[in-house]
């Protein structure tokens, strides 16, 4: 991995901080945010997703995360290109939706 790729990975890692507890949980199979302030988590074997309030997951934090993931994958996410389909450096799928495609302040799964 070259220096640029390493630095992008560090920035993504920092941007993932609001959802870190669920990323590190081996029972979690899906993490979704349908806007600022809350996360929905699906755990292996559970019948429904769990809702969690996450005050640090602001509109800015969602946009920042999407921009970092986009940069890592050689893409951009902005008002002209509000949809992002990429992967995190560790291989997890990342789908992002930013305004104006959503009015909720951004979303990801």
Show the residue positions of the predicted features.
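P-loop NTP-binding catalytic core
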Residues: 38, 42, 48-109
